[in-house]
């Protein structure tokens, strides 16, 4: 019996997805859907391709679904093709010198000379122009939003994978708490997270960290690029950590205080984050709307603070709708989007990042949740608290 190298969804799960995509094609009058993925956001810009194929790739990849042919993925880099064949649940081919030309020729070869083509993702302008110039019979329609709505409701298999990603994330955060100490560099904190994640079998997705003195002047939100700053006693460290099970990540945020309890300002920031978090979690259930979430977030401004990062976002795999801030932060984050209604088996991250107006101080608290029939289940096991280490 051969060893299983990578996690795989069942054939039934992939067939369910392909059926849903083909129904989208019927509804929108499409002859084919071309799904684009890149290595952005630590490969989570491959989320749509992963949904079709189970391949978590790098570089530019295109998955093609038609009505009558089995789905196929075109992998841009020739040396990535063997690995794609080890993990993909669909046919894999090389994308050739130009994936745009290869995809176009494939569609012609299967009889779609004058095709209405739905594309998904941030397709490069070079690809789009190549389709226009070299395949003038194609009519192209952006169906990204419609396609991603298919991914909002998680299947039982997806929920199982997300639970595993959340457990990996908890493990990595616990390693950070155990290993963090004054004298380390910020980037060395990232090493603690990655080592724990990889040694447990998880894939590091992201670890955003920021450190600074409680007296102010540090970053109010976790940094996407870890600095060389030396950790000192009295610091606060804000965290955003995601570790995945073959792309399906958890996501959690907790502040860590080095050697000292939070001062009065940071205690008020924490108390506000916790209260807004609990208010939000309380309203989450099928039928709840983005207005309910905005109501929960009003307490942040009432306490004299604002937010930098979003208040709630959809998740799994990668970012999904909705993306919700607070009413009072619309001037800095843009206006609220259209009304969003939550449904059972959606996954969302509740993540209040409560900051001072001058953004010289802030904390972030967050967890990944599964919307259940009667509420919301937290998928993380790390206690709902701030952590003081080295005291």
Regions found by a protein language model. Give the residues of each.
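Active-site neighborhoods and metal-handling regions in enzymes and metal-associated proteins
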Residues: 1-391
């Amino acid at each position: 019996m051969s060893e299983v190298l990578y996690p795989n969804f069942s054939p039934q799960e992939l067939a369910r997805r392909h059926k849903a995509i083909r129904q989208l094609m019927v509804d929108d009058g499409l002859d084919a859907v071309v799904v684009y993925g890149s290595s952005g956001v630590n490969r989570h810009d491959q989320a749509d391709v992963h949904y079709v194929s189970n391949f978590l790739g790098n570089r530019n990849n295109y998955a093609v679904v038609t009505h009558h042919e089995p789905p196929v993925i075109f992998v841009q880099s020739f040396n990535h093709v063997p690995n794609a064949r080890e993990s993909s649940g669909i046919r894999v081919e090389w994308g050739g010198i130009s994936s745009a030309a290869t995809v176009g020729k494939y569609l012609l070869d299967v009889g779609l000379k004058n095709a209405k083509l739905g594309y998904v993702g941030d397709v490069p302008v070079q690809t789009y122009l190549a389709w226009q110039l070299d395949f003038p019979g194609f009519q192209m329609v952006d169906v990204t939003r419609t396609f991603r709505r298919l991914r909002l409701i998680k299947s039982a298999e997806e929920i199982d994978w997300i639970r595993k990603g959340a457990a990996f994330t908890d493990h990595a955060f616990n390693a950070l708490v155990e290993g963090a100490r004054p004298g380390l560099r910020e980037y060395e904190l990232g090493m603690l997270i990655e080592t724990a994640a990889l040694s447990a079998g998880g894939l590091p997705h992201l670890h955003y960290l920021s450190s600074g003195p409680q007296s102010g002047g540090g970053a109010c939100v976790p940094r996407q690029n870890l600095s060389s700053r030396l950790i000192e006693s009295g610091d606060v460290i804000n965290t955003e950590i995601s570790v995945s099970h073959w792309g399906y990540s958890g996501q959690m945020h907790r502040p860590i205080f080095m050697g000292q309890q939070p001062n009065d300002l940071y205690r008020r920031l924490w108390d506000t984050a916790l209260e807004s978090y609990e208010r939000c979690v309380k309203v989450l259930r099928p039928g709840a709307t983005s207005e309910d979430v905005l109501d929960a977030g009003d307490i942040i401004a009432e306490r004299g603070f604002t937010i930098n990062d979003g208040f709630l976002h959809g998740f799994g795999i990668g970012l999904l709708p909705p993306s919700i801030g607070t009413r009072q932060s619309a001037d800095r984050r843009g206006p609220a989007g259209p009304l969003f209604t939550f449904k059972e088996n959606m996954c969302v991250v509740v993540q209040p990042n409560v900051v001072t107006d001058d953004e010289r101080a802030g904390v972030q608290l967050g967890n990944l949740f599964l919307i259940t029939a009667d509420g919301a289940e937290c998928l993380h096991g790390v206690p709902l608290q701030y952590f003081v280490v080295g005291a």
